[in-house]
Amino acid sequence: MDPFLLAAAHLLLRADRPEVIEESCQISSLLTGNTDYARCQATVLRETLLKGGLDQTVLDLLAGDQREATELVFEREEEDPVETSRQFGNNCHLPGSFQGALHAFLHHRESEDRFQETLRAVLRAGGCNCSRANYAGALLGASGAVIPSNWLDRLNRAEDIVNTIQRAANISHLGEGK
């Protein structure tokens, strides 16, 4: 999961570009030689961002083991996300970490408190939950979910974080138009 997370910011800042999936795979390959799941994760996140949500039509963009792993998540969408994540594998290995994050996101996507419920389900599943939480958070943000204000109130150095994000966005667009 971590190799894709290295590329997530690039994808989110440039989702409108058709070549962003391949660029994300190139970035991910800096940490791993296998980019099959990075491509899957990038495709799912990009579709979520471009459509403001996610449905099973994303399966048409996937192939092989990655499609099968994603299909299984949709098939089990109604099941308890904590137990399902444990069954997929609650460590950092793929496809389990991808499946656990995606499952929690899909399971809670209609909830008014989807941000909190999704991330709390990811955390309650235990194991190495940081990668799952990062990917679930990216899916939530891409779908328009908002970090609850009472969570932001407890955040240290929020202004520094916002400034860093703005600088990164500005840097990412410097080379465009060449």
Which positions does each model-derived feature cover?
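Amphipathic alpha-helical interface segments
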Residues: 1-109, 118-125, 139
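Conserved glycine-rich phosphate/nucleotide-binding loop
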Residues: 142-178
